[in-house]
Amino acid sequence: MENKTEVTQFILLGLTNDSELQVPLFITFPFIYIITLVGNLGIIVLIFWDSCLHNPMYFFLSNLSLVDFCYSSAVTPIVMAGFLIEDKVISYNACAAQMYIFVAFATVENYLLASMAYDRYAAVCKPLHYTTTMTTTVCARLAIGSYLCGFLNASIHTGDTFSLSFCKSNEVHHFFCDIPAVMVLSCSDRHISELVLIYVVSFNIFIALLVILISYTFIFITILKMHSASVYQKPLSTCASHFIAVGIFYGTIIFMYLQPSSSHSMDTDKMAPVFYTMVIPMLNPLVYSLRNKEVKSAFKKVVEKAKLSVGWSV
C-alpha cells in the first residue's frame, strides 16, 4: 500500500466530549466488554470440550463467537483507553490495521450468519436429509469461504481508503477508524472510493440477506404448518430472536455504509457503530447459544465436574 499522505497519525475524538457522560460510559463499556469476552470465549471452550456439541450448528456458533470476540477486541479496548488518556492519537499504520481487522471480521460475520441460516433451514425443513446436506466438508467450505470473503473485502476497503491523500485535518470524528469517518478527511477526490464502498458493501449484504431471508421464510412456513402449538412455539420464538439480532446487525451497518460521506453527521453516526461493535457481540452468545438446552446441559456438566474436582482436592 503506497502512502501518498502527509498525515502520519490520526486523532480519535471519541464517542462524546460531554464530561457528564464520561464516567457512565467508562463504567458501561468495560462491563459490556467483559460480558462479551466471557460469553464468546465461554461458548468456544464449551463447544470444544463437549462432544455432544460437535455438530454443524455449534461449529458455526463457535466461529461466530470467535469472530465477535476478534472484531469487538479490535475496537472496544481503544475506546476504553480513550476515557483514561487525553492523548487519543493513533498512528497511520495502526489506524489502517484496525480498519482491516474490523472490516475483515465484520464481513466474516455477515457470511457466517447466512451459513447459519442455511444450516437451520436444512435442519428444520429437510430434517431427513440434514446429515447428508450439512456434511463436514460442506461446513468447512462455508466457514473457509466466509473468512476468505472477509479478508478479501477488508483488503479492498482498506486499500481503497488509504490510497486517498490526507493532507488537511487528521481528527477522526469517531471512536475508532471506521471507513466513512476516515474517508471524509481525504483532501483528494473520493467519489470513486465512495462508490466502491457502497457497491461492495451492497453486494455483500445483498447476498447474505438473500440467503437469510429465503431460509427463514421457508423455516417460518414449515413451523406454521406444524399442527401442535406446543411444537412450533419454541422454534418460532428462537427464530424470532435470531431474526431480531440479525435485523439490528444489518440495520446499523446499512445505515452507516450505504450512504455517501456527505450525508453523514458524525455526531449522530457514532451511535450506530456502538451496536455492531459492542452490543451485538455481547448479545449473540445470549441469543444463539445460552438459550439452548444443549448448551445449558453442557454448562451444567462443566459446573458439576468442577465441583467434583474441588471436592476431591479438598
From Swiss-Prot:
Disulfide bonds join C95-C187. GO terms for biological process: G protein-coupled receptor signaling pathway; sensory perception of smell. The chain crosses the membrane at residues 24-44, 53-73, 98-118, 132-152, 195-215, 236-256, 270-290. Residues 1-23, 74-97, 153-194, 257-269 are extracellular. One of its GO terms (molecular function) is G protein-coupled receptor activity. It comes from Homo sapiens (Human). Residues 45-52, 119-131, 216-235, 291-314 are cytoplasmic. Its main location: membrane. Keywords: Cell membrane, Disulfide bond, G-protein coupled receptor, Glycoprotein, Membrane, Olfaction, Receptor, Sensory transduction, Transducer, Transmembrane, Transmembrane helix. One of its GO terms (cellular component) is plasma membrane. Belongs to the G-protein coupled receptor 1 family. The keyword rRNA-binding does not apply. Glycans are attached at N3, N17, N153. This is Olfactory receptor 5B3.
